[in-house]
Amino acid sequence: MRIQADFSLDFPRAYGTLEASADFRTVPEDFQVTENLGFEPAGEGEHVYLWIEKRGENTAWVAEQLAVYAGVKPTDIGYAGRKDRHAITRQWFSVYLPLKSNHPEPEWQGFSSDRIQVLRVARHVRKLRRGEHESNHFVIGLRQLQCADKTAFHERLDCVLRSGVPNYFGEQRFGNAGRNLIEAESLLVGKKPYRDRQKRGLILSAARSYLFNQVLADRVRKGDWQISVAGEPCAYPSGPLWGRGRPLALVELLARETELLSSWRDWCNELEHVGTSQERRALLLAIKTPSYRWLVGDHLELAFTLEAGAFATSVLRELVSLNNQQLRLSGTESSD
């Protein structure tokens, strides 16, 4: 059985050694996330859509409170992605409330509080499901940013925003100090049973994510993470999300990935019989609508948009060493 020391989360950076540091998330305003569904609610249907801004609360807790307030089952609540607790976030929730039912529609503004604000109400024809949104827009504050060479930092910043970064799963996917990976070892190798389906799903997701990061880390070390290689099954450079069925990579790339993950063969074998099907994930994370500005003192504000499922911390880790590592304990991802 593997132990905690076997699970390194120090994945290689594409742009070399960090020469800058900054304070991060000293206040919730330093991390703001706005969800983009990619479609507008239809204006009619059996599901009420609520555009909610939350501060200092996690998505699952808000969903639970919303079910209680609306008097519906927890399964009647939908949302596209978990958003960070230590932030100001705006996202959609759906509530199953057919117009013809005997269940009266609540006064939604009554759900608002000092930490939760209902900003918009609409109706739609279907429940909002996980991963259904298109992207997230981030506004991030980095305070007390220190760098030996500001010109070099600006060059690195411009290069990162223009060229993109390795599409690593963020450390928060793996739990505090990689705890989810220890749980994955117990589940996949030790055959520990998990009755909590949600917890089991999180553990399996962490395992798949860690194997993907191993493959991406190898591509970063070899310098070919931005280009397609022989055997690539997608129209873009990709890595495996292990699961049911046969691997999707073709002969050359499959041999390379299989060899790289040979020490994780026990995990791969188990993942082929549980959870979701084999998938591929892009190795390159493109950064859309990037901008930045310097505020008072050494306070840098970054703004950019990432596709669903991407991590803002994958961008930040290529720029600065973050003094406040509270982000490791919470989800800053777009769609999980």
Curated annotation (Swiss-Prot):
Q: Where is the TRUD domain?
A: 164-298
Give GO terms: molecular function aspect only: RNA binding; tRNA pseudouridine(13) synthase activity
GO biological process, alphabetically ordered: tRNA pseudouridine synthesis
Catalytic activity, reaction form: uridine(13) in tRNA = pseudouridine(13) in tRNA
A Gene Ontology term for the protein's cellular component: cytosol
* InterPro entries for this protein: PsdUridine_synth_cat_dom_sf, PsdUridine_synth_TruD, PsdUridine_synth_TruD_CS, PsdUridine_synth_TruD_insert, TruD_catalytic, TruD_pseudoU_synthase
Q: Where is the active site?
A: D84
Q: Which UniProt keywords apply?
A: Isomerase, tRNA processing
List its EC numbers: 5.4.99.27
- One family name in Pfam for this protein: TruD
The record's listing under HAMAP family reads: TruD
What does the record give as the function of this protein?
Answer: Responsible for synthesis of pseudouridine from uracil-13 in transfer RNAs.
The record ties this protein, via PANTHER family, to: TRNA PSEUDOURIDINE SYNTHASE D
Query: Into which family does the record put it?
Result: Belongs to the pseudouridine synthase TruD family.
Query: What is the name attached to this protein's record?
Result: tRNA pseudouridine synthase D
